[in-house]
Amino acid sequence: MNAAKNTLSIKSIFLDFKEITKAGLAISVLFSSIAGYLLGVNDEHPFKWSVLIVLAIGGYCMVGASNAYNQVIEKDIDSLMDRTKNRPVASGRMSKVTALIVASLLTIIGIVLLYTINAKSAMFAAISIFLYTSIYTPLKTVTSLSVFVGAFPGAIPFMLGWVAATGEFGIEAGTLFLIQFFWQFPHFWSIGWFLYDDYAKAGIFMLPTGNKDRKTALQVILYTIWLIIASLLPVLGYTGQLFISPVAAVLVFLLGLWMLFYAVRLYQLRTPKAARTLMLVSVSYISLLQIVFIVDKFLR
């Protein structure tokens, strides 16, 4: 009987840890860092399994810490929304003190691990955690500009992989940052659209106009176009060692048109279903784009 209780307790702790760090989100973000690392390795900076593993663990800690801090800060807000009311801190399964300890440990472990790769990686991880928890999270209930602020830490992981591989932040890392920066807007605005009512309960501002209207949908289209332009910069030869072939550029452009189609569809329909579809497409888009970049590099 005691063994069964202990097993249940361990399972509950694991599930709460998984939820407070948002494991699914953390792993998807981690994929961006790994993609950036694979794009950054070369003869001068060869691939190393040890670096990749440390980047993966450190990156997970970075994202997990941000998410844990977020759930501590938004305990009362989370309890108001159907989507978040069962989170560990909001539901009372985990105390704020325990969550803060978890977040602090993840912060320390993540930054120390990334520092063993290079100082710049640790610095960008620290900046990401600070921006996400200290500026983006509090702004969510104040202004829709929170999405703009949140786009900065959200765009760091892709770039972080390149910095981990090379130890340098130049035009290449900046381009990867730019791609994921512009991607944040259609992605998060589509989430803010189809979860509009839930966010409204907690007084969270996500949409640029505050409403599910044509002006918001138009901005989704415009940022998707900026995303397409940014994603094609590497084919022009102006982004240093970050380069994609014309064939890869065609694939990247087609992916962009695919996402743009659903952005325009949101403008036409302005329904939660259209917004949710765009959100799902955006998630697939960024992963497929990164895969195209990687495959193209290693096939050349």
Curated annotation (Swiss-Prot):
Pathway: Porphyrin-containing compound metabolism; heme O biosynthesis; heme O from protoheme: step 1/1
Protein localization: Cell inner membrane
Spans traversing the lipid bilayer: 20-40, 49-69, 97-117, 122-142, 145-165, 176-196, 217-237, 242-262, 278-298
Record membrane topology: Multi-pass membrane protein
Gene Ontology CC annotations of this record: plasma membrane
GO BP annotation list: heme A biosynthetic process; heme O biosynthetic process
EC numbers on record: 2.5.1.141
Nuclease among keywords: no
Assigned keywords, A-Z: Cell inner membrane, Cell membrane, Heme biosynthesis, Membrane, Transferase, Transmembrane, Transmembrane helix
GO molecular function (one): protoheme IX farnesyltransferase activity
Main localisation: membrane
Pfam families recorded: UbiA
Gene3D superfamilies xrefs: UbiA prenyltransferase (1.10.357.140)
Reaction(s) this enzyme catalyzes, per UniProt: heme b + (2E,6E)-farnesyl diphosphate + H2O = Fe(II)-heme o + diphosphate
Taxonomic superkingdom: Bacteria
Entry's family note: Belongs to the UbiA prenyltransferase family. Protoheme IX farnesyltransferase subfamily.
Protein purpose: Converts heme B (protoheme IX) to heme O by substitution of the vinyl group on carbon 2 of heme B porphyrin ring with a hydroxyethyl farnesyl side group.
NCBIfam families assigned to the protein according to its UniProt record, in alphabetical order: cyoE_ctaB
HAMAP family found in the cross-reference section: CyoE_CtaB
Other comment: Carbon 2 of the heme B porphyrin ring is defined according to the Fischer nomenclature.
Name of the protein described by the UniProt record: Protoheme IX farnesyltransferase
Organism from which the protein derives: Flavobacterium johnsoniae (strain ATCC 17061 / DSM 2064 / JCM 8514 / BCRC 14874 / CCUG 350202 / NBRC 14942 / NCIMB 11054 / UW101)
Lineage: Bacteria, Pseudomonadati, Bacteroidota, Flavobacteriia, Flavobacteriales
Gene name linked to the record: ctaB
